[in-house]
Curated annotation (Swiss-Prot):
CDD domains: TIM. The lineage of its organism: Eukaryota, Metazoa, Chordata, Craniata, Vertebrata. Triosephosphate isomerase is an extremely efficient metabolic enzyme that catalyzes the interconversion between dihydroxyacetone phosphate (DHAP) and D-glyceraldehyde-3-phosphate (G3P) in glycolysis and gluconeogenesis. Gene3D superfamilies: Aldolase class I. One of its GO terms (biological process) is methylglyoxal biosynthetic process. The keyword Phosphoprotein applies. It comes from the Eukaryota. This is Triosephosphate isomerase. The gene is TPI1. It catalyses: dihydroxyacetone phosphate = methylglyoxal + phosphate; D-glyceraldehyde 3-phosphate = dihydroxyacetone phosphate.
Length: 249
């Protein structure tokens, strides 16, 4: 990892937790040592964004797990970037594979969400990744490049964007991409950014890995030159998340 790219660890709590056990998790995180050269962001369920922001130490930022593409309107059940900011969160996760595959979100919709969230001043953790059949068909690059292009077309300022590579076959399955597999895709993504955005963005943009990251797998993954951090699911609800935060130490 280039020294200019600050290590980034996001915890995606998904649809888990209640105030009592999330409060315990927050106490654990507040007591944890967060290295000065590591940025930590937690994404609680929407209902608990306010609770998490009030309880979490300021050293840990808060993200929403999703948002809609406009500021207000007749969109029952949705939340806008302006509302997310109003609750004290500063980031949003967009394009997560569960949004793509469980809820049928298209590349186009995700791109529109990215554009609106950035315009409203949120940082964006933009997720991309191939399914198992796509990897086995040898089209990993094609898939992730197409997804990245739609995101890139909607980004003016890359300093507010973290790209999260999440091979769908490794999310919640216990299967982790090997450090070499992760590095290979991250390196190719950086090459795509160099060719299609700019060399400066390719050097500075953080590309993080998600997909069954645990305390046991994080150190070797973090040692890869193009892996700039993690987006962590299940393990972010456990004390081992502290080990992942310290993966570079």
């Amino acid at each position: 990892m280039a020294p200019s790219r600050k290590f980034f660890v996001g915890g995606n709590w998904k649809m888990n937790g209640r105030k009592n056990n999330l409060g315990e998790l927050i106490n654990t995180l507040n007591a944890a040592k967060v290295p000065a050269d590591t940025e930590v962001v937690c994404a609680p369920p929407t209902a608990y964004i306010d609770f998490a922001r009030q309880k979490l130490d300021p050293k840990i930022a808060v993200a929403a797990q999703n948002c809609y593409k406009v500021a207000n309107g007749a969109f029952t059940g949705e939340i806008s970037p302006g509302m997310i900011k109003d609750l004290g969160a500063t980031w949003v996760v967009l394009g997560h594979s569960e949004r793509r595959h469980v809820f049928g979100e298209s590349d186009e919709l995700i791109g529109q969400k990215v554009a609106h969230a950035l315009a409203e001043g949120l940082g964006v953790i933009a997720c991309i990744g191939e399914k198992l059949d796509e990897r086995e068909a040898g089209i990993t690059e094609k898939v992730v490049f197409e997804q990245t292009k739609v995101i890139a077309d909607n980004v003016k300022d890359w300093s507010k964007v973290v790209l999260a590579y999440e091979p769908v076959w490794a999310i919640g399955t216990g299967k982790t991409a090997t450090p070499q597999q992760a590095q290979e895709v991250h390196e190719k993504l950086r090459g795509w950014l160099k060719s299609n955005v700019s060399d400066a963005v390719a050097q500075s943009a953080r590309i993080i890995y998600g997909g069954s990251v645990t305390g046991a797998t994080c150190k070797e993954l973090a040692s890869q030159p193009d892996v700039d951090g993690f987006l962590v699911g299940g393990a972010s609800l456990k004390p081992e998340f502290v080990d992942i935060i310290n993966a570079k130490q």
